[in-house]
Amino acid sequence: MTKKPTRGKGEGSIYQRADGMWCTSIELTPGLDGKRRRKVICRKLKQDMTDARRKALAQLDKHGDLSTSSVTVEKWMNHWMNDIAPQKIRPKTLAGYKTVVTGYIIPILGKKNLDKLTAQDVRKLHKTIQSTPKDPALRGQRNLPEGTEMLSSTYALLAHNTLSAALKVALREGRIHSNPCDLVDRPVKRVTEQKALDVPQAIQLLQHLAARPDGPLWATYILTGARRGEILGLEADRITDTLDLSWQLQRITDITKAPADWEYRKLPGKSLYLTRPKSRAGWRIIPLVEPLRSILRLQVGNQQDGLVFTRDGKPWDPDRATKEWRNVLIDAGLPDDVVLHGSRHTTVDLLYEAGVPEAIISEIVGPSSRSVTRSYRSRGNTKQLADAMSKMSELLGTIPA
């Protein structure tokens, strides 16, 4: 007696419906909600259905899954954002992704089936974002005021990169067979003017800061080119003959979604943490020279550890520091359109003005769009770095400590 051939796991059955269509169903891995999933293929001719079934099984064997119409872009983006991305992506970066996912990707493409997403849809995402008023109050209005500012290509670029990252995972899992983002040119990030204080203005500011109780905080920004969180998170035990900028203060709303290998320390205050820079290349150690050496020694005093700069004994809120910086500039009689991050650009310009080589500037301030970041990062360059910082101090002249 001839033994009837058996079907392999997941290969499903072949049957003919009442309307004459030949169909087969292939069992797949459970869906994002844990429910059963099947790929159903129907053709008018049995041979066509058999051919389609064979191709589908080959795809299943190759990719481990088959696309179905049950997963929408909205469902996949939420799954990626909540269950996949947090394993690799830092909380602050993830928060930016969440904003663009909920604000743009889902409203524009969310109802599309994931496996039906095309290059044209990605272009639609770009175009829709760049035709959206920057002012939320104007969105949805048909007749916009003349000169209404729209969202820049930078927003479109962030949306493109976020969608592409989520689709790469979908491609790897076999839920789609190509990433449509790869077929479309990425939006070009808009070049914005990077305003900075010039040498006379920097001197004017430092002289003004000498009389302020919080002057050491703002002077440290100008004299180091450090990032906002690096100075707010500076601790006394990381100040010697050098300044160790290997931690930064950040506000993290949901630390439970942090990657397992991410280093952080909780600080007093709601959602405030000390975190490591994105990569070890960002752990900078710069020499202390005058007047910064005296400024910091007076600030630290006999303090052995803990944050150097606090507000009413508590860690600074990063956003509060940004707002207070503007008030400092106004009080000093200086333009208030140089943002706190612009103090980095001021430091870069001062170092250039002092004749410091570009490679040394990059080692002092870290990656900056105002200077070229070299691929190497020497740790044995202490003398050159100290000379560079001294040149900048000489350029600024004698500033009261």
Locate each region found by the language model:
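N-terminal DNA-binding module of tyrosine recombinases/phage integrases
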Residues: 17-124, 299-302, 308, 314, ...
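Major-groove DNA-contacting interfaces characterized by cationic-aromatic clusters
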Residues: 65, 69-71, 75-76, 115, ...
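Short, basic (Lys/Arg/His-rich) helix/loop patches that form interaction surfaces
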Residues: 134-135, 206-214, 224, 286, ...
